[in-house]
């Protein structure tokens, strides 16, 4: 019970701080909706090395609140979500403290490394979503039009929910090496088999990237490369896990 109260207390405190920093918080969250966001400028720079006249047209997408309480409730829920994200290192620390008395010294060291890797990979997924997947998806979907007579107006709820969904999705996807390690330790996955099906995996990754991103080549490349690198890392991780099985 004390553990839960400590976790809840830290999460709420961070959420309150974030809630009080309303302008700064939403300046960061809404930055990908601006046409001069850093991702668009970097893509322009890279593409101009290949296509000299490439550039992103300036765009503007209206964000609206349709309910009386929607802005407040979105502010509140976003603060809680970011509070939980900000408190996650402390939560992992408390959970480790809770189970550590039952662990051997070697298991404690192993657990600390695994927790650090899981957290690092999750945060890399969050950054991947913020700087690549979400802004490019927003640009495509927000400016897509079936007719000049139709003007896109997006609700704040839709914007934030999509942002959170993609962030969590990429955070989970980036756990592939960790999942592969445990599957390798259980003997379910073999490094040689993963290497043999490398080309098949690349095609599957490209298909998944094409589904979750706008249909343009640059976006496909930006999403496919890190996902495929995760697969390559997973092969090496599974190879280590397979060797550990033989030595155990």
Regions found by a protein language model. Name each.
Residues 1-248:
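Membrane topogenic/interface segments and analogous intrinsically disordered interaction regions
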